């Protein structure tokens, strides 16, 4: 695929599937990438070079920045680790009883949140760092998203739980996904009013947190990431969702290798990018919304791997025309 000034591939990509891409808290320059190749990598996307790589004992399933010089990660070895970019040091913070699937930082509550296949969410105090509580979930945690001081957790069995991070004594809301199939990804609106949820069956739901009936009336779901081939519809998992912090619009990435940008409030697709080499595994907008990181890798959902499986992270400069709601 030809590179354009608006889009290029990162040099030194991971050697195996990318599990997560995350931009630094205040930058469109630093990108954290976790991978099944047992590394966490830090890239400078402006100069297109890999600044640091932290080798791990097992595949890494998620990562996040805490601030501009520290990051966290977790994966199949069940250990939450923290990295200091200035000293190039790494330390273990604590453990789950099964692989860690999700790692997020909540700035409003100043906690690191991990979700695991052991059916718990744990909170970690980044100041010490140490465990600040363990909270049972109804099933394996597949995805979670921080929404202000609330936490939205998606588990197996299509369960959705809304927690208040300032008071984890009880679950604030228990919901069931409005999509019929397994939940793949949840991300919350930057305006904190709701969240977007995707499933393995080419659908996305836009949900609102306010339980009042008039607000709940606004929720809806739509089909996407489906391709007609020889009169048959092929339906693909929607693996990734990323929000534009400025415009409240969002991108979705599917196993069809396509990235779409949506205006969730006006129920419109704003644009669709060209097809990428393989499935879209993860997406992240920079804080100012000027750059979108797109991880493309083979995700073993098709029966046969392609002849060439290419792991790549594309950096795309996006503009208002692609990401801003049409007035």
What is each PLM-predicted segment?
Residues 1-327:
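WD40-repeat beta-propeller superdomains and closely related acidic/aromatic-rich repeat-like regions
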